[in-house]
């Protein structure tokens, strides 16, 4: 599969963007950072119809941004620092999606002690970040089932946006008007993207 895909890239993909690739060999200046889930069904470049060099994409389980902690999880934090300080991106988008396995794992393990998720291994430690989304659930959120899953997906996006603002470099860039933060949610079944209103937190499909 990979070999065949590379052959198609060399035959049609690279020639179509050859000029862009040659320019990008000198460096990158993507205007947008996207923090997305590593789920194979959610491809930011495809969803936003972006070409080479247009998006700086970071993917992790459940598209999470942990709070800034120099002694804690640093992978996503390093990417944020590089995007804001090194690349000077103007926008950061946290994009969740329907049927997120990381969110589902957190829901199934609720009730674990603080700082733990109840799930095993690295995944368990990582998704404990979702705990911060509990306070952002709407008061009328369903208590279980697909409705609770979706409510947590949106609440977790809002939580990650709040956590972004705990990074001093992000807060400074936002306060200076150099950086904007956005939340979005992709529905896999129908290909619809909903965007969170930064003022109200409400979600709507962009026109």
Region annotations inferred by a language model:
Residues 1-30, 53, 63-90, 101-207:
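Divalent-metal-activated hydrolytic enzyme cores
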Residues 25-44:
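N-terminal low-complexity or amphipathic/hydrophobic leaders
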Residues 35-37, 59, 93-97, 182-187:
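Short beta-strand segments
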Residues 39-41, 97-102:
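Gly/Ser/Thr-rich loops at beta-strand to alpha-helix junctions
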Residues 40-62:
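Catalytic core of membrane glycerolipid acyltransferases/transacylases, capturing the structured
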């Amino acid at each position: 599969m990979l070999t065949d895909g590379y052959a198609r890239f060399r035959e049609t993909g690279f020639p179509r963007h050859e000029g862009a690739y040659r320019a990008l060999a000198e460096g990158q200046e993507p205007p947008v950072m996207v923090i997305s889930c590593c789920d194979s069904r959610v491809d930011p470049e495809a969803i936003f119809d972006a070409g080479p060099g247009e998006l700086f994409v970071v993917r992790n389980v459940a598209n999470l941004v942990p709070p800034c902690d120099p002694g804690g999880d640093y992978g996503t934090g390093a990417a944020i620092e590089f995007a804001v300080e090194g690349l000077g991106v103007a926008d950061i988008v946290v994009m969740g999606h329907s049927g997120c396995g990381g969110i589902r794992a957190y829901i199934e393990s609720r009730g674990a002690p603080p700082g733990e998720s109840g799930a095993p291994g690295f995944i368990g430690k990582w998704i404990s970040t979702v705990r911060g989304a509990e306070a952002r659930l709407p008061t009328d959120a369903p208590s279980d089932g697909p409705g609770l899953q979706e409510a947590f997906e949106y609440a977790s996006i809002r939580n990650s946006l709040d956590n972004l603002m705990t990074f001093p470099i992000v807060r400074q860039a936002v306060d200076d008007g150099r950086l904007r933060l956005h939340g979005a949610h992709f529905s896999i079944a129908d290909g619809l993207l909903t965007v969170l209103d930064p003022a109200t937190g409400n979600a709507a499909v962009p026109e």
